Structure formats: C-alpha cells, structure tokens
C-alpha cells in the first residue's frame, strides 16, 4: 500500500473510532498493540495427561510450535511460555493459551481464563462438552469410528437437537463400540443450558436378518405409532444400518407427520451410495426428517502431533493477519487517533478466533478426519404451494413432495457448522411460502370484495380472520381462489336471475357447494376457508377442522301484547288481599266504637266516635293517611288506633313499592317461550322452516316429539316472500332458523320501524357445529386444529364472533332494561288513576242522589204524620 492511500475499511474504522471516542466515554485500552509488543502465548500440557498417554507431548509441542512460528510468522512476534501443570494461574498479560489435558481439567482451566480474559484453545479427549463457541476453540481427539458420542454431545450443546424426549434406535454393535453414547445423549448441563432428556432406548439386534428383523422392528415401532385421530409429537434418533427398513415400516404406521422429528445417521459403509430421495420416495409431505451422512475419509491419518501442528499454524496465521491490519491502519493516522481506535484485548481475541476457524475450515486435514454432512427435508406445503410463487415450478425429484437441502456439517475441530436448522419446519413452519386456499362468498363467515375484473381485493369475516391468524402463526402467505370462479365454463353467478330483495336474511352452512367438495379432493389446496356444518365426518371425502363455532336454532313469533294497565292500581295486591283489607276495615270500626262506648268514665268517651259510622270514616281516613278531628282519650282506644296506624304504614308502604314495580315492569300476555307450548296457541296456524338447515336432518334421528310434529306441519321456505315475516308480525306464523339469523331479522325491523314487533323463544336447541374443510390427504389437520384451539384460549374467535355476527339488538332483555330505566309515565300508565277518580265521582253522585231521595222520604213521612 502506498503512503498516500488508505483502504476503505480503514477509513470506516477510523471514522467509527473517532465518533466513539468523542461521544462515548470509554475505559483506557491498556493492552499493547502487536506493533509495540509481541503476542503472549501460554502452552499448558498436563503432566498427568502425558503420563497416561506415555509420550512427552510438551517436548513435541515445543518443537512443532517453534518450527511453525519460524516458518510462517511474517509479521509481529509471539512470546511463548510452556507449563506442565494444569493448575497454573495465568496472568492477564497473556493473550491466549493452548492446553492439552483431559475434559475435566479443560473446563476448570476455561473458568480460570475467563477471570483474566485469556483466549483458550483446548486440545482434549473426546466425549467432552464443547466450550462456548464464541469464547474458545476446543479440538477433541476423536478416533476414527468413535465419533458418535462427541457428535451427539455437540448436537445437544449447539442446540442442533433441542429435544426433551427421544426414542433412540441403535444397533447393538454400535452401542458396544461406543460405550459413552447413551451418556452423551442424556447429558445435561446448567453451564451450557442443556436441558435433561427423557430417553427410550431400543437396542437393535443386528444379527437378525430377513423377516425376523422386520418383525422385531415393527414390534418396536408400533409402540410409538399414533392412534386414530390422535396427535403425537415425538423425536426419533436412528443410528442403525437398517435405517431403510425403519423408514419403510414407520411409514406404514403413519409415524411420519408434522409432529414427529426423525434424525437418521447413515453409517460409513452406505453413506457414499446413499440417495435420500430414493429412501423417502413413499413418504408423504409434512414429514420432518434429516439425515447425517458419514463423509469421513478412511485414508486420513490423524495424530496428536498433526493436530498440534494445525492448531499452531492457524494461530500464527491469525496473529500475522491482525498485525498486518494494524500496520496498514497505523500508517495512515496519528498516534492519538491510533490510541483511540486500536483493538482492545477482547476484540483481538474475537478476531483471532474467527481467523482460526476460517483457516481450519479450508486447511484442516488431520484434525478433521471425521466429517458428517447433514441434509434435511423441506416438505411442508409442497403440494399446496401456489405455482406462481414456487422457487422450482417443475420438480424432477423422485418424490415431488420432498426437497433435500444441505444444512451444514460436523467436524471434531469446529463442531456443527450449519446455515440452517436441522428441522426448519418445527421452528419456521411453512417458511413463508404462498399457499392456495379455496373459499366462497358467504357472509358473515366469508365476505369477499372483488374489483371490476372479478379479482378478490378484500376478504373478511369470521373464517377469514381465522385464516389470517393461521397465516401469521404458521408463517405462510396465501392466494385465495373462489370456488364459483375456478372454471369459467362452470362458473356460478350468485346474482344472475335473482332478486336481491327476495333473498333471505342471514346465512346457512349445512349445504356445502358442490364445487368446493370437488376441488378440495385433489389435495391442491391447503384448506377450504368455508364455514361448513359438521355432519357424518367419517363418511365425507374430506376432513373437518376443529369446530370454530356452534350455532343454535330458535324460533321467532309475534311479541306478546302488553297487559292492559287500566286496573294497574289493583295490581299490587291480590284479590284475597283486597278482600282481607276490606274485612279488617269493617272489623276495626266496630271495635273502636265498642272500646269508646265501654270506657268506664263518661269524660273519656269521645262524642265524635259515638257512632259506628263516625268510627268507620275515622278508620278509612287513617288508612288514606288523612287522620281525623277526634282521638280517643282512653288508653284502650288509643291502643286500637295506634296499632291500626302501624297496619296502615305497612299497607301503604307495601302498596306504593309494588305499584312502582308494576309501573316500571309491564306485564305481557303469555307468549311462546318453548316449542312444546305451540299447542296452547291456536292463533298460530302456520309453521315455517328455512330451507337447507341441519335441523331437518337432526329431526330424523331425534326422539323429541315436538320437533317431529313441527316438521310434519312446517312449510319449507327459501325466499323472503315464502318466509312471510308479515304473518309472523300478525301472530299467525312461527319460523325456525339459526338464532343469529332471527336476531338479524329483529334488528333490521327495529331499525326500520323503531319498534319491537317480534320475540325470540327462550329455548335454543340443536347445537350445529361449524368447521372449516381440509383435504382428506392433508398432513396438517392436527396442526391447524392445535392453532384453532389456541385461538379459542386467547379469545380471538369469540372476539371475531362479536365483530361479525349480529348482536341481540335493542329488543333483547338488556336493552329492555335500559328502556325501563328511562321509562316516562304515559297515559297508558295513568288511565287506572283516572278510572279511580271517575269511580269516586260516580259513587259520590250516587250517594248524593240517595241523600236527596232520603231527604224527600223523611219530608214526606213528616207530612203524613202531621196530617194524621
């Protein structure tokens, strides 16, 4: 590089460093640059480890490392210190440390280096949990053929197999040769966040051949086969030479579905000739299956010295690259700027680790003799994916529902190097593919809005909201196909030749359009987004999902007339109470008269209460809370009057309270609350039933006689004219339909006439389950059902019902209660009051007439006496 030039990366690094130095206060970087000081490296070879292996590893290491540094370190320098005691405590001046010791000491040394921020490069035994990949480099010495324990251990540590339970099928020979295999599978660690795993181990007798082998495998697999209509989510690990037989038998037992995961290790003797497409040719889409293929070079010669040489070369190469980078940047900036932006110790260690991994990926030979490549199947939605959006519209694979991708590989030095999940569908479901979905216009379940070209531009409704949530939860987009417009020659027009004003209010789901049934049988659609009544599911050429709604039937009649309020003033008391009240008045007046007359002292006798008539008017006036001019002076009389006042208080309070209640809550004539009451209402002469209802089918198998009697007399209607809602308003007809449809009728009439003319029965009967439709061959029925249940638990579906289905409206009980709260007294309420006043005037007139007659009678009698 010329002095006047600067690399773009160096410029960006300079600007970023200057910005950080100005805006963010940082701690001083006290670790020396490679330009001013050599890198410090510690080499620790455990003495006990050398004793166990019977060779002087430290001496070999010293010679190999010095040769590598001398021959390959072109820039910078490295100061190396050697130790033979694994408990040594290194100072923070060291940049990195290379250790050769057993697994336990390796982990102990790693914990110590974290305190002093030293990069650890560990060479250790196999079957050792891998150190954190972003903080250290661990190279287990794996013998050829003994890699299974380390491989499984790495799969758990790196979350390749993040399982909590596993069913393991392993050959007896492999289990004997790898004694630590089971220990690796069940390994758990709090440090590495490895959860414990429940293990079911089945040891395959690999000496069996032919039919005996297949019978034994079938017996073992059948224990984990799903029962009918049962969803089981299990994980299977297969390490066997008989993997093809296991796949074939498991397929016949329906064990390859969206809930199960299969990791199959293909052994070295067959891996080179292995074809995943051939093995899975009979599997249906929806399976989660991955293969680990053995690509170990049988001629590779691995040794500890060779591994030490490769690790040393990778480290020296990394330090040399970083030194070159520092030189290129330092030459273009000032010393102050350099101090602000140069690498910290942790940044250097991270760069060294990445450079070493990149070097080992491309140049490692002996430390990567063992190598396994992992392939996984992409299967979900392959047959229902929209052809316009397919990445490969024409699939030439042996199984068109399977596409195998290479997700990465495993080596002892790097562990798993993966660019994709082992089971991508478990985490990402349909991986954002575009699915074909079938639907029809059927408000309020599916509401489709189309433009002038007939293309669906908006969709809503209960079913469509569920589809949208499924799309979000299962990670797919979708393309809607309307069944009536799928084939032009068979297109169905929903409006041609029809009168919109004669259409029935509401919707039904019992009759599924024939085109929907025909199109869904080809398994080309992920789901038919239509609301369909669940009926005889075992006899249909398709499957129903979990019910998304339950609709009940009811009936609509004329609202009962309100009872006349002309006698409202008598309503608070029963007839018996009124007669009893009259009786106690007639009884109390003579009692008061007698008590007053029997007073022993003449001065205690009240002149105004000396007749029964005057006592009666006194008692009557007290009842009306008017009082009187006279009051008994004797204690006996006062007791009678006092207790009568108590009776009056109770009577008046009770009467007034009940009168308010009767004013507030009107009474109605008896209506039809239950279907079995129809016989008592002779004025209802017409029975109606909507065409195409599940109620018709249900009555054929029910034992309720009132249902059967109704159906015998019912007139099936299919239009608004035949529905004859005016006859219902007149009280001559009753109709049966979904309760929500009847509520919609009541609501529309109320909005138009501002008055409630109809009443719905209190009885709701015949639960009609409504679900969506999936193809009979669909692998995703249980998956869809699981998410529908989740929507129910979260309240989504209930909310969508409230948004799209008609509410009870202003004629229901709650709305009537609101009307009662704001009730104003009108003439209907007060007519009884005026009737009482009229009755009083009439009685007064009659009494006046009687008094005139009596006066004339007395006058004539006196004249006769005078004449005589």
Curated annotation (Swiss-Prot):
Q: Where in the cell is it found?
A: Cell membrane
The record lists the membrane-crossing segments as 566-586, 643-663, 833-853
Q: What happens when the gene is disrupted?
A: Impaired response to environmental cues such as temperature and humidity. Response of dorsal organ cool cells to changes in temperature is abolished and consequently larvae fail to avoid cool temperatures. Response of sacculus neurons to changes in humidity is abolished and consequently larvae fail to move towards their preferred humidity.
MF-aspect GO terms: glutamate receptor activity; ligand-gated monoatomic ion channel activity; transmitter-gated monoatomic ion channel activity involved in regulation of postsynaptic membrane potential
Q: Topological domains (Cytoplasmic): residue ranges?
A: 587-642, 854-868
Which tissues does it occur in? Answer: In the antenna, detected in sacculus neurons which innervate the first and second chambers (at protein level). Expressed in multiple cells of the larval dorsal organ ganglion, including the dorsal organ cool cells where it is predominately localized to the dendritic bulbs (at protein level).
Q: Which GO terms describe its biological process?
A: detection of chemical stimulus involved in sensory perception; modulation of chemical synaptic transmission; synaptic transmission, glutamatergic
Glycans attached where?
38, 205, 294, 305, 432, 475, 499, 543, 691
Q: Which InterPro entries match?
A: Insect_Ionotropic_Sensory_Rcpt (IPR052192), Iontro_rcpt_C (IPR001320)
**Keywords carried by this UniProt record:** Behavior, Cell membrane, Glycoprotein, Ion channel, Ion transport, Ligand-gated ion channel, Membrane, Receptor, Sensory transduction, Signal, Transmembrane, Transmembrane helix, Transport
The yes or no answer to whether the keyword Protein biosynthesis is present is: no
Which segments does the topology annotation call Extracellular? 29-565, 664-832
The secretion signal range is 1-28
Q: Does the keyword Glycoprotein apply?
A: yes
The protein's topology relative to the membrane is: Multi-pass membrane protein
Q: Report the principal subcellular site.
A: membrane
| Superkingdom of origin | Eukaryota
Q: What's one GO-annotated cellular component?
A: membrane
What is this protein's function per UniProt? Integral part of various neural sensory systems in the antenna that provide the neural basis for the response to environmental changes in temperature (thermosensation) and humidity (hygrosensation). Together with Ir21a and Ir25a, mediates the response of the larval dorsal organ cool cells, a trio of cool-responsive neurons, to cooling and is required for cool avoidance behavior. Together with Ir25a and Ir40a, mediates the response of the hydrosensory sacculus neurons to changes in relative humidity, and is required for dry detection and humidiy preference behavior.
Q: Which PANTHER family match?
A: IONOTROPIC RECEPTOR 20A-RELATED, IONOTROPIC RECEPTOR 60A
Q: What is stated as this protein's family in its record? A: Belongs to the glutamate-gated ion channel (TC 1.A.10.1) family.
Name assigned to this protein: Ionotropic receptor 93a
């Amino acid at each position: 590089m010329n002095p006047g030039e600067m690399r773009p990366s160096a410029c960006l690094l300079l600007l970023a460093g200057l910005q950080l130095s100005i805006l963010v206060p940082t701690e001083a970087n006290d670790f020396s640059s490679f330009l001013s000081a050599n890198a410090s490296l510690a080499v620790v070879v455990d003495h006990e480890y050398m004793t166990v292996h019977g060779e002087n590893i430290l001496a070999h290491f010293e010679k190999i490392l010095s040769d590598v540094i001398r021959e390959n370190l072109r820039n910078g320098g490295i100061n190396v210190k050697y130790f033979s005691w694994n408990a040594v405590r290194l100072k923070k001046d060291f940049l990195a440390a290379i250790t050769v010791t057993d697994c336990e000491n390796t982990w102990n040394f790693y914990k110590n280096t974290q305190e002093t921020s030293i990069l650890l490069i560990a060479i250790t035994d196999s079957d050792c949990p891998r150190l954190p990949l972003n903080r250290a480099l661990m190279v287990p010495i794996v013998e050829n053929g003994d890699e299974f324990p380390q491989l499984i251990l790495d799969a758990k540590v790196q979350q390749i197999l993040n399982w909590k339970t596993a069913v393991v099928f392993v050959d007896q020979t492999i289990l004997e040769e790898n004694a630590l295999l089971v220990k690796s599978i069940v390994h758990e660690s709090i440090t590495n966040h490895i959860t414990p795993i429940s293990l079911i181990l089945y040891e395959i007798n690999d000496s069996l051949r032919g039919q005996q082998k297949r019978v034994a495998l079938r017996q073992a697999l059948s224990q984990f086969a799903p029962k009918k209509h049962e969803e089981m989510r299990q994980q299977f690990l297969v390490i066997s030479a008989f993997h093809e037989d296991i796949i074939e038998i498991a397929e016949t037992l329906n064990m390859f579905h969206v809930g199960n995961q299969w990791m199959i290790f293909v052994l070295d003797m067959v891996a080179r000739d292995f074809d995943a497409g051939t093995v899975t040719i009979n599997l249906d889409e929806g399976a989660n299956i991955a293969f680990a293929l053995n690509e170990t070079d049988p001629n590779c010669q691995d040794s500890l010295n060779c591994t030490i040489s490769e690790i040393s070369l990778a480290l020296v190469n990394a330090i040399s690259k970083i030194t070159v980078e520092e030189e290129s940047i330092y030459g273009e900036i000032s010393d102050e700027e350099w101090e602000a932006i140069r690498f910290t110790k942790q940044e250097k260690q991270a760069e060294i680790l990445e450079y070493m991994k990149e070097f080992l990926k491309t140049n490692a030979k002996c430390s990567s003799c063992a190598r396994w490549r992992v392939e996984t199947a992409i299967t979900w939605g392959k047959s229902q994916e929209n052809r316009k959006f397919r990445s490969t519209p024409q699939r030439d694979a042996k199984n068109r529902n399977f596409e195998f991708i290479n997700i990465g590989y495993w080596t002892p030095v790097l562990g798993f190097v993966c660019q994709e999940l082992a089971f991508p569908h478990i985490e990402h479901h349909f991986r954002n593919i575009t699915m074909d979905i079938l639907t029809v216009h059927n408000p309020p379940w599916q509401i489709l809005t189309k433009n002038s070209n007939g293309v669906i531009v908006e969709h809503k409704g209960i079913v469509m909201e569920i589809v949208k949530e499924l799309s979000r939860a299962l990670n797919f987009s979708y393309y809607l196909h309307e069944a009536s417009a799928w084939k032009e020659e068979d297109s169905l027009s929903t409006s041609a030749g029809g009168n919109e004003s004669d259409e029935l209010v509401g919707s039904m789901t019992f009759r599924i359009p024939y085109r929907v049934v025909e199109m869904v049988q080809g398994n080309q659609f992920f789901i038919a987004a239509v609301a369909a009544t669940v009926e005889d599911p075992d006899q249909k050429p398709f499957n129903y999902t979990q019910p998304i709604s339950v609709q009940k039937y009811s009936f609509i009649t004329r609202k009962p007339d309100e009872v006349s309020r002309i006698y409202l003033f008598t309503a608070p008391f029963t007839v018996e109470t009124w007669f009893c009240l009259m009786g106690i008045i007639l009884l109390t007046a003579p009692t008061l008269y007698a008590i007053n007359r029997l007073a022993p002292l003449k001065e205690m006798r009240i002149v105004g209460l000396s007749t029964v008539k005057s006592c009666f008017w006194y008692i009557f006036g007290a009842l009306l809370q008017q009082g009187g001019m006279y009051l008994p002076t004797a204690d006996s009389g006062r007791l009678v009057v006092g207790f009568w006042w108590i009776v009056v208080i109770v009577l008046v309070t009770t009467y007034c309270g009940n009168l308010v209640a009767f004013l507030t809550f009107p009474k109605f004539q008896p209506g039809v609350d239950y279907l079995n009451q129809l016989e008592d209402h002779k004025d209802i002469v017409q029975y109606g039933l909507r065409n195409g209802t599940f109620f018709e089918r249900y009555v054929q198998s029910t034992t309720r006689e009132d249902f059967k009697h109704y159906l015998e007399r019912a007139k099936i209607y299919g239009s608004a004219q035949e529905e004859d809602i005016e006859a219902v308003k007149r009280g001559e007809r009753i109709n049966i339909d979904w309760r929500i449809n009847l509520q919609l009728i009541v609501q529309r009439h109320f909005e138009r006439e501002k008055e409630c003319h109809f009443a719905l029965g209190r009885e709701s009967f015949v639960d009609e389950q409504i679900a969506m439709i999936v193809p009979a061959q669909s692998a995703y029925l249980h998956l869809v059902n699981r998410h529908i249940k989740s929507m129910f638990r979260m309240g989504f579906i209930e909310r969508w019902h409230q948004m799209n289905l008609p509410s009870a409206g202003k004629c229901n009980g709650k709305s009537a209660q609101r009307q009662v709260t704001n009730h104003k007294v009108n003439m209907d309420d007060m007519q009884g009051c005026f009737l009482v006043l009229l009755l009083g005037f009439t009685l007064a007139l009659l009494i006046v007439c009687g008094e005139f007659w009596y006066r004339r009678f007395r006058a004539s009698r006196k004249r006769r006496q005078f004449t005589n």
